[in-house]
Amino acid sequence: MYLLGHIIGWLWLMLTVAIGLSRHSVKSANRFLILSRIGYLLIIITGVALAIRTLSGNWWLTLLKVILGLGTIGLIEVAFARKQESHLNSGLVTLLVCGTLLTIICGIGLHWQLTGNLI
């Protein structure tokens, strides 16, 4: 149940961030920033519940996933702040995409190692 909520939260976050950062209007981007923060809440709540359950199985990969997840959320906040100032550059977007992909790969790896199932 927590895993499904966590995945839905990440999908919601990726959707709102992609749409929000592609908006030309700052006001429109701010709406998606607020919507993305709803995703943060879901991700953090389900992430804590999942981390408690996976910490005994693989503590170092769980810790890495937590650090990558929080770092990705931080990069999203920085990207939206730069968008509001009209200073969003491609380097930051590339870093955000790479951070998100690393977080997803780490999460899939953690799930695979603990359950033996890829998905």
UniProtKB/Swiss-Prot annotation:
A GO cellular component entry from the record: plasma membrane
Native source species: Lactiplantibacillus plantarum (strain ATCC BAA-793 / NCIMB 8826 / WCFS1) (Lactobacillus plantarum)
Protein's cellular compartments: Cell membrane
One Pfam short name: DUF1516
Protein's UniProt name: UPF0344 protein lp_1373
Cross-referenced InterPro entries: UPF0344
Family as reported in the entry's similarity comment: Belongs to the UPF0344 family.
Annotated NCBIfam families: PRK13673.1-6
HAMAP family linked to this entry: UPF0344 (MF_01536)
